[in-house]
Amino acid sequence: MELKLCVCGVLLVSLTISGSLAQMDVCGVAPLNTKIVGGQSADAGTWPWQVSLHRDGSHFCGGSLISSRWVLTAAHCFPSSSLRGLLAYMGRDNQDFLNPNEVSRSVTRIINHPDYEDTPNNNDISLLELSSDVTFTDYIKPVCLAASGSVFPANTNCWVTGWGDIQSGVPPSFPQTLREVEVPIVSNSDCSESYNTLTDNMICAGLTEGGKDSCQGDSGGPLVCKNGTVWVESGVVSFGRGCAQANFPGVYARVSRYQTWISQQIGSDLPGFVTFVSDGSSGSDGSGNSAPGSVHLVYFTVPLLFSLLPVLFSVLVLS
């Protein structure tokens, strides 16, 4: 019995670690992203985890590929659980021309956070299960997710992407190419002066003077921050007052608050979770290398271990 328990324990940990490590090998890596400073339209492949969600042929929300079969997005994008006409496009560059690097999948399951509240958009996060796995390419890769304990100090520079309006009520022009904007993190204490319904499940980003922000149609898309050599999703586009208004930064669901919930829903093929820790400074670490923060890889989670306990039980008790 002791030997059997030991062997099963080693097997359990080995399988769990190997599965998570496989995801960590690819998440947050964007080979075609050579960006240093901001632009407007993003080159194809710059943000390979960006997902375009379509209902009956029209884009309505963004999302992020977080593993070969799962997309992270916003709960407010899905007031209904209907799967009719719902498609997810990965590797898409624009909404009007052909996209030779894209693939599409239907969505087989929508999992809104059980504690989502449409007022004040608390826990505005959702998971979508795709109909089949997608193959990773330079144009299609998963993003790393901020792990529990991640810290995003004020003025940490991050990027938000999407096909939303370029300003309130003004849709993007033909051919509706994926757009990007660089925005600094705003502390929750400062952000709460603009939004009195702000909670710890939210993170804010934007310029005090306005002019740069996510907008309608960007909902569910990623706010990502570079951590060493990988990109980490810190937030999911949630809400704001208008678009890019002065003193009203964009508000995002804080991804690091949901590591346990995400892991419990997915069970296997877990995303790569990275603990983002930054001093809020930009530039170099003195060696000529960019040093926005440090990376601590999270290889496996307690929920996944518990999900495998029935297997161990059957092996130990029934054999």
What are these regions (language model features)?
Residues G57-H59, C77-F78, N94-Q95, E117-D118, ...:
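Solvent-exposed loop/turn segments at secondary-structure junctions
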Residues A30-V37, Q50-D56, A147, T156-A291:
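Extracellular trypsin-like serine protease catalytic domains
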Residues S41, F97-E102, T119-N122, T137, ...:
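Gly/Ser-enriched beta-turn/beta-hairpin loop segments
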Residues E2-L72, L87, R92, F273-S319:
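Protease-domain processing segments flanking chymotrypsin-fold serine proteases, especially trypsin-like
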Residues T46-P48, S81-G85, E102, N123-I125, ...:
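Extracytoplasmic
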Residues N99, I111-E117, D133-S173:
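Active-site substrate-binding loop(s) of clan PA
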Residues V71-A75, N122-A147:
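Conserved active-site neighborhood of the chymotrypsin/trypsin-like protease fold
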Residues V29-K35, L53-H54, V71-A74, P79-D118, ...:
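Conserved H-D interstitial segment of serine endopeptidase catalytic domains
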